């Protein structure tokens, strides 16, 4: 969904405190290639709307200086690795934290293969060669390692779910629009919460169901993926999974 000015104001008024927008390139061809659009013109149109959305979010009160507005980019080796520096430059100009995401095998339809993963360390090295960086670290239960530009140009973050899994302290639980709870982004199935929501809400039962789900979770998909080919880097996907469009990021 592209963010318009009115929607941004409505979300802010409703109590939303932060927004992350996604952009995988800074030219029409790159955007089209990564989004599966018809051509450079279609990609350029989407790029224009994303740049406008950044302005709408800022005007609505989502302040990037307070971490309320960030920019995500998924990077693949042959798809948009050439966009690393342009994306970093755009984020620096806009005062946004750029969050680079390793290409992940979420779902079953994105054509994921290990060879297309551009490791976080390589992404950081490429950007750091242009604008020197110093590490900030990864917050407890956080998904991204963070770096600070030494020239004061803001921060860079990288989600290294493939090459540096963080399953051990992950505390993410996702609930889909149709009421199913997933305790891992890479899960194949979840727990249906609707029995505690319909025909009337059972708050105590819902709380107990969520507590039981969390205490019983054994999710460590990213760690298990690496164990398939120990010492050889990224392993192959393990099993079918729910699609990202269904789960959310």
What is each stretch, according to the model?
Residues 18-20, 68-70, 97:
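Structural preference for beta-strand elements that scaffold enzyme active sites
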Residues 5, 27-35, 107-111, 192-194:
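A short acidic, helix-capping loop that chelates divalent metal ions and anchors anionic groups
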Residues 28, 38, 53-87, 100-111:
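Conserved strand-turn element in the central/C-terminal portion of the radical SAM core barrel
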Residues 86-93, 103-249:
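Auxiliary Fe-S-binding modules of radical SAM enzymes
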């Amino acid at each position: 969904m592209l963010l318009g000015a009115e929607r941004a104001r409505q979300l802010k008024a409703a109590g939303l405190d932060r927004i992350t927008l996604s952009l995988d390139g800074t030219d029409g061809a790159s955007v089209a290639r990564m989004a599966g659009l018809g051509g450079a013109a279609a990609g350029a149109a989407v790029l224009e709307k994303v740049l406008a959305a950044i302005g709408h979010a800022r005007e609505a009160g989502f302040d990037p200086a307070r971490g309320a507005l960030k920019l995500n980019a998924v990077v693949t080796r042959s798809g948009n690795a050439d966009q690393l520096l342009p994306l970093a430059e755009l984020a620096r100009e806009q005062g946004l934290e750029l969050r680079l995401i390793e290409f992940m095998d979420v779902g079953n339809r994105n054509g994921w293969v290990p060879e297309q993963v551009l490791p976080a360390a390589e992404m950081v090295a490429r950007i750091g060669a242009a604008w020197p960086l110093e590490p900030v670290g990864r917050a407890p239960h956080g998904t991204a390692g963070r770096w600070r530009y030494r020239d004061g140009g803001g921060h860079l973050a990288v989600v290294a779910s493939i090459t540096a899994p963080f399953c051990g302290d992950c505390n993410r639980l996702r609930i889909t629009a149709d009421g199913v709870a997933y305790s891992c982004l890479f899960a194949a199935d979840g727990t249906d919460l609707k029995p505690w929501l319909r025909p009337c809400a059972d708050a105590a039962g819902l709380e107990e169901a969520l507590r039981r789900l969390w205490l019983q979770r054994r999710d460590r998909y990213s760690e298990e993926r690496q164990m398939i080919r120990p010492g050889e880097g990224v392993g192959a996907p393990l099993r079918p999974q729910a699609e990202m469009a269904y789960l959310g990021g």
